[in-house]
Regions:
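Alpha-helical membrane-associated segments of multi-pass integral membrane proteins
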Residues: 5, 92-137
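Canonical alpha-helical transmembrane segments
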Residues: 42-65, 69
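Interfacial non-cytosolic loop connecting adjacent transmembrane helices
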Residues: 24-44, 80-110
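Hydrophobic alpha-helical membrane segments
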Residues: 47, 66-91, 113-116
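Hydrophobic core of alpha-helical transmembrane segments in multi-pass integral membrane proteins
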Residues: 13-17, 51-52, 73-77, 117-124
C-alpha cells in the first residue's frame, strides 16, 4: 500500500472523530450512548469510500484540486449526517423531537466545525495528493 491512501485514511479518521466530538452536544446529555469508537464517529466508512473514489479519480486523471474538493464535499455531507445521528442518540432519544427540530439544532452546531475540519481536510489532502515523493516506486 502506498503512503498517500494511508495518510488520507488516517486524516479522515482523525478529522471525523474531531468534528463529531466538536459539534456534539456536551451539556448534561447522555454522552455514553455514542462512544468514540462507534462507526459514525470513527470515520471508517467515509475513509474507505474516499479511498475508492481517489482510486477512480486517479485512473481518470482528474485534477488534484477537483479530487480534493469532491472528497471534502462528500466528507462534509457525511459529517453533517453523523452529527444528526449523534444528536439523535444523545439528546433527541430522551425527548420528543421531530426531524425538523433535530435539524434546527444540528445545522447551527455543525457549521463551524464542518467548515474548519473541511478546510483542514481539503488543504491536507491536496498537499498529500500533489506530493510526488510518496508515490509507490517499482
Amino acid at each position: 500500500m502506498t503512503r498517500k491512501p494511508l495518510l488520507i485514511f488516517l486524516l479522515t479518521l482523525f478529522l471525523t472523530a474531531l468534528q463529531v466530538q466538536w459539534a456534539g452536544p456536551a451539556d448534561g446529555h447522555d454522552a455514553g450512548t455514542v462512544s468514540l469508537l462507534s462507526p459514525e464517529v470513527l470515520g471508517a466508512y467515509p475513509g474507505v469510500l474516499l479511498l475508492f473514489l481517489l482510486a477512480v479519480f486517479a485512473r481518470r486523471h482528474m485534477p488534484l484540486l477537483r479530487q480534493a474538493a469532491i472528497c471534502t464535499g462528500l466528507l462534509a455531507v457525511y459529517w453533517l449526517l453523523a452529527n444528526y445521528v449523534t444528536f439523535d442518540a444523545r439528546v433527541a432519544s430522551w425527548s420528543t423531537y421531530t426531524p425538523l427540530e433535530i435539524w434546527t439544532h444540528v445545522l447551527p452546531a455543525s457549521v463551524i466545525s464542518i467548515a474548519a475540519c473541511g478546510a483542514a481536510f481539503f488543504c491536507a489532502s491536496w498537499l498529500i495528493l500533489r506530493e510526488t515523493r510518496w508515490n509507490k516506486r517499482g
